[in-house]
Amino acid sequence: MSYLRPAVVLLILLTLITGIAYPLLTTGLAKLMFSQQANGSLVMLGDEVVGSSLIGQNFTQLGYFSGRPSATAEMPYNSMASGGSNLAISNPELDKAITERVKSLRQANPTQTGPVPVDLVTASASGLDPQISLAAAYYQAPRIASIRQMPLSEVKQLIDSNVQKATPNFFGESVVNVLNLNMALDAQSHVKVPATSTKS
Protein backbone atom coordinates (compact mmCIF):
# COMPACT_ATOMS: atom_id res chain seq x y z
CA MET A 1 0.00 0.00 0.00
CA SER A 2 3.03 2.26 0.29
CA TYR A 3 2.94 2.93 -3.43
CA LEU A 4 -0.79 3.81 -3.47
CA ARG A 5 -0.56 7.13 -1.59
CA PRO A 6 1.99 8.78 -3.96
CA ALA A 7 0.02 7.50 -6.96
CA VAL A 8 -3.21 9.08 -5.69
CA VAL A 9 -1.43 12.33 -4.80
CA LEU A 10 0.15 12.45 -8.26
CA LEU A 11 -3.21 11.77 -9.92
CA ILE A 12 -4.88 14.59 -7.99
CA LEU A 13 -1.98 16.96 -8.64
CA LEU A 14 -1.90 16.28 -12.39
CA THR A 15 -5.70 16.56 -12.56
CA LEU A 16 -5.56 19.99 -10.93
CA ILE A 17 -2.72 21.14 -13.19
CA THR A 18 -3.84 19.73 -16.55
CA GLY A 19 -7.58 19.70 -15.98
CA ILE A 20 -8.11 23.04 -14.23
CA ALA A 21 -5.06 25.30 -14.00
CA TYR A 22 -3.76 24.84 -17.56
CA PRO A 23 -7.15 25.31 -19.31
CA LEU A 24 -7.91 28.39 -17.19
CA LEU A 25 -4.48 29.86 -17.91
CA THR A 26 -4.62 29.30 -21.68
CA THR A 27 -8.23 30.53 -21.90
CA GLY A 28 -7.38 33.64 -19.88
CA LEU A 29 -4.32 34.42 -22.00
CA ALA A 30 -6.30 33.85 -25.20
CA LYS A 31 -9.06 36.23 -24.12
CA LEU A 32 -6.48 38.79 -23.06
CA MET A 33 -4.25 38.63 -26.13
CA PHE A 34 -6.64 37.42 -28.86
CA SER A 35 -10.06 38.48 -27.63
CA GLN A 36 -11.92 38.26 -30.94
CA GLN A 37 -10.50 34.88 -31.92
CA ALA A 38 -11.04 33.42 -28.44
CA ASN A 39 -14.71 34.38 -28.64
CA GLY A 40 -15.31 32.69 -31.99
CA SER A 41 -14.26 35.45 -34.43
CA LEU A 42 -17.82 36.76 -34.37
CA VAL A 43 -18.91 39.24 -37.03
CA MET A 44 -21.06 42.11 -35.79
CA LEU A 45 -23.51 44.34 -37.64
CA GLY A 46 -24.28 47.09 -35.19
CA ASP A 47 -25.19 45.30 -31.96
CA GLU A 48 -26.21 42.07 -33.70
CA VAL A 49 -24.06 39.00 -34.25
CA VAL A 50 -24.52 38.00 -37.90
CA GLY A 51 -22.08 35.11 -38.01
CA SER A 52 -18.49 34.07 -37.61
CA SER A 53 -15.63 34.73 -40.00
CA LEU A 54 -14.61 31.09 -39.46
CA ILE A 55 -17.89 29.41 -40.46
CA GLY A 56 -19.64 29.75 -43.80
CA GLN A 57 -23.30 30.55 -44.33
CA ASN A 58 -25.80 29.28 -46.87
CA PHE A 59 -26.59 32.40 -48.91
CA THR A 60 -29.45 31.51 -51.25
CA GLN A 61 -30.47 34.87 -52.73
CA LEU A 62 -29.01 35.48 -56.19
CA GLY A 63 -28.17 39.02 -55.12
CA TYR A 64 -25.52 37.68 -52.77
CA PHE A 65 -22.27 35.87 -53.39
CA SER A 66 -22.62 32.20 -52.54
CA GLY A 67 -19.98 30.06 -50.89
CA ARG A 68 -18.84 26.49 -51.29
CA PRO A 69 -21.39 23.68 -51.07
CA SER A 70 -21.68 22.25 -47.58
CA ALA A 71 -21.86 18.54 -46.86
CA THR A 72 -22.71 18.83 -43.16
CA ALA A 73 -25.57 16.78 -41.81
CA GLU A 74 -29.13 18.03 -41.23
CA MET A 75 -28.58 21.48 -42.72
CA PRO A 76 -25.85 23.35 -44.63
CA TYR A 77 -22.98 24.77 -42.57
CA ASN A 78 -24.07 22.94 -39.43
CA SER A 79 -21.10 23.59 -37.15
CA MET A 80 -22.17 20.76 -34.84
CA ALA A 81 -21.71 18.22 -37.63
CA SER A 82 -18.53 19.31 -39.36
CA GLY A 83 -17.32 16.94 -42.04
CA GLY A 84 -17.14 16.28 -45.75
CA SER A 85 -19.31 14.00 -47.85
CA ASN A 86 -16.61 11.28 -47.84
CA LEU A 87 -17.59 10.41 -51.40
CA ALA A 88 -14.73 9.11 -53.52
CA ILE A 89 -14.01 10.83 -56.82
CA SER A 90 -15.21 7.65 -58.55
CA ASN A 91 -18.53 7.65 -56.68
CA PRO A 92 -21.54 8.18 -59.02
CA GLU A 93 -23.30 10.19 -56.30
CA LEU A 94 -20.48 12.75 -56.27
CA ASP A 95 -20.57 12.99 -60.06
CA LYS A 96 -24.34 13.49 -59.97
CA ALA A 97 -24.10 16.17 -57.26
CA ILE A 98 -21.41 18.10 -59.14
CA THR A 99 -23.37 17.88 -62.40
CA GLU A 100 -26.47 19.30 -60.70
CA ARG A 101 -24.44 22.10 -59.09
CA VAL A 102 -22.84 23.03 -62.40
CA LYS A 103 -26.27 23.13 -64.06
CA SER A 104 -27.68 25.32 -61.28
CA LEU A 105 -24.72 27.72 -61.44
CA ARG A 106 -24.95 28.05 -65.21
CA GLN A 107 -28.65 28.88 -64.92
CA ALA A 108 -27.93 31.49 -62.24
CA ASN A 109 -24.98 32.94 -64.19
CA PRO A 110 -26.09 32.79 -67.85
CA THR A 111 -23.44 35.25 -69.08
CA GLN A 112 -20.62 33.00 -67.90
CA THR A 113 -19.66 30.47 -70.57
CA GLY A 114 -16.29 29.39 -69.19
CA PRO A 115 -15.55 26.58 -66.74
CA VAL A 116 -17.22 26.79 -63.34
CA PRO A 117 -14.63 27.26 -60.55
CA VAL A 118 -14.15 23.96 -58.78
CA ASP A 119 -14.76 25.33 -55.28
CA LEU A 120 -18.30 26.36 -56.24
CA VAL A 121 -19.27 22.75 -56.96
CA THR A 122 -17.22 20.78 -54.40
CA ALA A 123 -17.56 20.77 -50.62
CA SER A 124 -14.55 21.23 -48.38
CA ALA A 125 -13.29 18.61 -45.95
CA SER A 126 -14.89 20.44 -43.03
CA GLY A 127 -18.07 21.42 -44.86
CA LEU A 128 -17.83 24.82 -43.17
CA ASP A 129 -15.37 26.84 -45.28
CA PRO A 130 -16.23 30.57 -45.13
CA GLN A 131 -14.01 31.55 -48.07
CA ILE A 132 -14.06 31.08 -51.82
CA SER A 133 -11.33 31.60 -54.38
CA LEU A 134 -11.04 34.83 -56.32
CA ALA A 135 -12.04 32.90 -59.45
CA ALA A 136 -15.27 31.83 -57.73
CA ALA A 137 -16.02 35.41 -56.67
CA TYR A 138 -15.28 36.86 -60.11
CA TYR A 139 -17.46 34.16 -61.70
CA GLN A 140 -20.47 35.48 -59.76
CA ALA A 141 -19.64 39.16 -60.27
CA PRO A 142 -21.74 39.73 -63.45
CA ARG A 143 -24.83 38.25 -61.77
CA ILE A 144 -24.33 40.41 -58.69
CA ALA A 145 -23.75 43.52 -60.80
CA SER A 146 -26.96 42.90 -62.75
CA ILE A 147 -29.18 42.26 -59.73
CA ARG A 148 -27.67 45.03 -57.63
CA GLN A 149 -27.64 47.46 -60.59
CA MET A 150 -23.96 48.19 -60.09
CA PRO A 151 -21.17 48.57 -62.65
CA LEU A 152 -19.27 45.30 -63.03
CA SER A 153 -16.03 47.14 -62.37
CA GLU A 154 -17.38 48.30 -59.01
CA VAL A 155 -18.29 44.75 -58.00
CA LYS A 156 -14.84 43.51 -58.99
CA GLN A 157 -13.25 46.34 -57.03
CA LEU A 158 -15.32 45.29 -54.02
CA ILE A 159 -13.96 41.75 -54.38
CA ASP A 160 -10.40 43.03 -54.65
CA SER A 161 -10.77 45.13 -51.51
CA ASN A 162 -11.84 42.06 -49.51
CA VAL A 163 -9.04 39.73 -50.61
CA GLN A 164 -7.35 37.71 -47.89
CA LYS A 165 -3.86 36.94 -49.11
CA ALA A 166 -2.11 33.73 -48.16
CA THR A 167 0.61 34.08 -45.53
CA PRO A 168 3.28 33.59 -46.71
CA ASN A 169 2.36 34.36 -50.31
CA PHE A 170 3.68 31.08 -51.67
CA PHE A 171 1.56 29.05 -49.22
CA GLY A 172 -1.91 28.58 -50.68
CA GLU A 173 -3.97 31.02 -52.73
CA SER A 174 -5.69 34.30 -52.02
CA VAL A 175 -9.34 33.97 -51.03
CA VAL A 176 -12.29 36.13 -50.06
CA ASN A 177 -14.56 35.66 -47.04
CA VAL A 178 -18.13 35.35 -48.36
CA LEU A 179 -19.85 36.82 -45.30
CA ASN A 180 -17.55 39.84 -45.19
CA LEU A 181 -17.93 40.34 -48.93
CA ASN A 182 -21.73 40.23 -48.76
CA MET A 183 -21.76 42.68 -45.86
CA ALA A 184 -19.56 45.05 -47.86
CA LEU A 185 -21.89 44.56 -50.83
CA ASP A 186 -24.92 45.53 -48.75
CA ALA A 187 -23.12 48.61 -47.47
CA GLN A 188 -22.19 49.78 -50.97
CA SER A 189 -25.22 48.78 -53.03
CA HIS A 190 -28.30 50.99 -53.23
CA VAL A 191 -30.39 47.95 -54.23
CA LYS A 192 -31.14 45.94 -51.13
CA VAL A 193 -31.77 42.20 -51.23
CA PRO A 194 -33.46 40.33 -48.36
CA ALA A 195 -30.77 38.22 -46.71
CA THR A 196 -31.83 34.58 -46.52
CA SER A 197 -28.84 32.73 -45.22
CA THR A 198 -28.70 29.80 -42.87
CA LYS A 199 -26.54 30.72 -39.92
CA SER A 200 -24.75 28.03 -37.95
From Swiss-Prot:
It comes from the Bacteria. GO terms for cellular component: plasma membrane. InterPro entries: KdpC. The keyword Nucleus does not apply. Belongs to the KdpC family. It is found in: Cell inner membrane. The chain crosses the membrane at residues 6-26. GO terms for molecular function: ATP binding; P-type potassium transmembrane transporter activity. This is Potassium-transporting ATPase KdpC subunit. It is a single-pass membrane protein. HAMAP family: KdpC. The keyword Repeat does not apply. The system is composed of three essential subunits: KdpA, KdpB and KdpC. Part of the high-affinity ATP-driven potassium transport (or Kdp) system, which catalyzes the hydrolysis of ATP coupled with the electrogenic transport of potassium into the cytoplasm. This subunit acts as a catalytic chaperone that increases the ATP-binding affinity of the ATP-hydrolyzing subunit KdpB by the formation of a transient KdpB/KdpC/ATP ternary complex. Keywords: ATP-binding, Cell inner membrane, Cell membrane, Ion transport, Membrane, Nucleotide-binding, Potassium, Potassium transport, Transmembrane, Transmembrane helix, Transport. It comes from Yersinia enterocolitica serotype O:8 / biotype 1B (strain NCTC 13174 / 8081). It holds the Pfam family KdpC.
